[in-house]
Amino acid sequence: MLNFYEGRNAVCDLPLERTLLNHLGWSGNLCAPAPYVIDAHPELIERIAADDMVRGITVACGGFFGPQGRQLRIPLADPRQNEKIESFSYNGLQITNFEMESSALAGLARLMGHKATTCCMVIANRLIKEANTGYK
């Protein structure tokens, strides 16, 4: 979504974007248009993140199923996508979850001069096929 707004490069973490694209082997039209990386506001992270919270990178996917590495009855363009995402590391951080909104919210907030961060609770671990059904 952020690729459609002026000022996108000014608010994105361009070195992380390049590193992720190289790691995934994405180029041209394979799998996704140019992804964008938005850092959470550091002040808000320090205010919210407790010592018992896992800090990591959230991948905000551009859709359900295929963009999140889930195969239906149609083969994925990159069947190793989840494996590549799981092995990615940048400045000591790893990708800890998939969802669809965080980067858009953080990016739009930053473009408008606001501070934003997200705190995500892991409900389903698709890799080991477990879900937390008792969360509140």
Predicted features along the sequence, with ranges:
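Glycine-rich phosphate- or other oxyanion-binding loops that anchor nucleotides, phosphorylated ligands
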Residues: 1-136
